[in-house]
Design a protein with these regions (language model features):
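Acidic interhelical loop/turn segments
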Residues: 135-155, 184
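Alpha-helix N-cap/N′ positions at the starts of helices
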Residues: 7-8, 99, 152
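Amphipathic alpha-helical dimerization/coiled-coil segments
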Residues: 84-135
Length: 208
């Protein structure tokens, strides 16, 4: 059976597939150390509204822990629903919404020092995010071998660490190019067509 669910609902179902029963708060905690790095970590209110929807559809079941707190587990139908969604719908191409790149595009409208400060701040933010994700990755050690419960989450964490490293390299390379342009008197902040993109090279592509 197929259900017309938002992607967030499928994401929450997926977080319940690791063999444990979670409260809404615990599900929020799990989302904060997983989904926030590559999707969106939903607010508590959204989590509870989605859990109510999923329970009404029979995709999750509630279990009273004896203390009056509801815990949630995925049902067989819920697990099959996630499998169907993954096998019968395309993942789609990710839409990149990059505020730093957007502002860099318009760098010719401000002074180079402002743009450089923005890039330096971004490098600092990347370092902080990488530290957070590295902690998550480390917590998966010992349970991340092929066939173990957290093998695929560890692959996602490694992907995220590589992404942060790549973004850091790109930002630092951009700052170097701006410094070189300033030293030779050229204007690297805008491309020859006025788009602000500059001329890319094969080496500018992010590496996995």
């Amino acid at each position: 059976m197929t259900h017309n669910l938002p992607v967030t609902a499928y994401a929450l179902l997926g977080l319940l597939t690791f063999g444990d029963e979670l409260t809404g708060y615990e599900l929020k905690q799990r989302a904060d150390v997983t989904l926030r790095f590559y999707w969106v970590s939903p607010a508590m209110s959204q989590i509870y509204s989605e859990l109510a929807r999923l329970a009404g559809l029979g995709l999750v079941a509630t279990v009273d822990d004896g203390g009056g707190t509801a815990r949630y587990r995925i049902t067989d139908e819920g697990r099959e629903t996630v499998r169907t969604w993954m096998s019968e719908t395309p993942a789609g191409f990710p839409v990149l919404k990059h505020p730093v790149a957007l502002r860099l595009l318009m760098g010719h409208l401000t002074d180079p020092a402002t743009t450089r400060a923005m890039l330096e701040e971004y490098v600092g933010d990347l370092a902080a995010a990488r530290r957070d994700l590295a902690g998550v990755r480390e917590s998966l050690r010992g349970r991340d071998a092929p066939g173990e419960a957290f093998h695929h989450p560890s692959l996602v964490a490694d992907w995220g660490l590589s992404y942060f490293d790549s973004e850091t390299r790109i930002a630092r390379r951009t700052m170097r190019r701006m410094a070189e342009a300033a030293s030779d008197g050229s204007d690297e902040s805008s491309g020859s067509d006025g788009s602000g993109a500059g001329s890319g090279t094969e080496g500018d592509a992010p590496r996995p």
